[in-house]
């Protein structure tokens, strides 16, 4: 009674051979760590450039919308006053409108520069980590997650505010 085990011993039965197609693929693959690194670098640079273009386009649309609102409000003011505005008043309003636009534009530029510096910093840290630990990419996973979050915040500013 005490000589036998109550349950049979577990034996893992898994194939230890790989398909010929898979082995051939590994042998014929020309991809190296350096080429993967360069591809990743190019992808990151393209993504940052795309984000910059999208942000500039979004900023231009916002400025156009503000200008349109100002033109509409000015047109309404002109209709209400029935031509009582003189050139001095119009030039003063125009200057105030320009100042508002410049202020808004400078605020957006400053915020964008800060975000881009932060993304660039994380990107360089990630690349440094990946080059220091080419075979241990899990060590760099927290940096990769942080980079992905920052890049998505650049792409969609509402992501971080939820």
From Swiss-Prot:
Entry keyword annotation includes Hydrolase: no
Localisation per UniProt entry: Mitochondrion inner membrane
Lipid bilayer topology: Peripheral membrane protein
Predominant cellular place of this UniProt entry's protein: mitochondrion
Alphabetized UniProt keyword annotations: Membrane, Mitochondrion, Mitochondrion inner membrane
GO BP annotations listed: cristae formation
Pfam families: DUF1690
InterPro entries, sorted: DUF1690
GO CC entries: MICOS complex; mitochondrial crista junction
Protein purpose: Component of the MICOS complex, a large protein complex of the mitochondrial inner membrane that plays crucial roles in the maintenance of crista junctions, inner membrane architecture, and formation of contact sites to the outer membrane.
Family according to the record: Belongs to the MICOS complex subunit Mic19 family.
Description of how the protein assembles with itself and partners: Component of the mitochondrial contact site and cristae organizing system (MICOS) complex.
Protein name: MICOS complex subunit mic19
Biological source species: Schizosaccharomyces pombe (strain 972 / ATCC 24843) (Fission yeast)
């Amino acid at each position: 009674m005490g000589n036998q085990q109550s349950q049979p011993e577990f034996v893992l039965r898994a194939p230890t051979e790989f398909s010929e197609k898979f082995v051939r693929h590994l042998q014929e693959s020309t991809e190296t760590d350096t080429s993967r690194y360069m591809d990743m670098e190019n992808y990151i640079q393209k993504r940052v450039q795309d984000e910059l273009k999208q942000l500039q386009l979004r900023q231009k649309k916002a400025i156009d919308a503000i200008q349109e609102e100002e033109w509409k409000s000015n047109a309404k003011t002109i209709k209400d006053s029935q031509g009582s505005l003189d050139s001095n008043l119009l030039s003063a309003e125009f200057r105030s409108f320009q100042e508002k636009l410049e202020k808004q534009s400078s605020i957006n530029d400053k915020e964008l520069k800060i975000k881009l510096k932060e993304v660039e910093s994380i990107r360089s840290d990630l690349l440094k980590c990946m080059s220091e630990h080419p075979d241990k990419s899990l060590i760099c996973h927290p940096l990769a997650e942080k980079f992905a979050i920052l890049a998505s915040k650049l792409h969609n500013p509402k992501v971080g505010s939820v």
